[in-house]
Curated annotation (Swiss-Prot):
The gene is rpmI. Belongs to the bacterial ribosomal protein bL35 family. The keyword Ribonucleoprotein applies. GO terms for molecular function: structural constituent of ribosome. PANTHER family: 54S RIBOSOMAL PROTEIN BL35M, LARGE RIBOSOMAL SUBUNIT PROTEIN BL35M. Keywords: Ribonucleoprotein, Ribosomal protein. NCBIfam families: rpmI_bact (TIGR00001). This is Large ribosomal subunit protein bL35. The keyword Ubl conjugation does not apply.
Length: 64
């Protein structure tokens, strides 16, 4: 059986921490920002953790 490939799009969007958690950037922070409040945009700047329910799917895409 051949080696399974890593999803290259996922590699660019997620980063695995030393403890095994997966970090991701918030969505909704690229365009049409004038209608969003400063408070909302400030919250979207932060790096978030992948939810436990999504961990398996993201881990399989990263394959490392």
């Amino acid at each position: 059986m051949p080696k399974l490939k890593t999803n290259r799009g996922a590699v660019k969007r997620f980063k695995v921490t030393g403890s095994g958690k997966i970090k991701r950037a918030a969505s909704n922070h690229n365009h049409m920002l004038t209608k969003k409040s400063q408070k909302r945009k400030r919250r979207l700047r932060k790096i978030h953790e992948v939810a436990p329910s999504d961990m398996r799917a993201v881990s399989e895409m990263l394959r490392d």
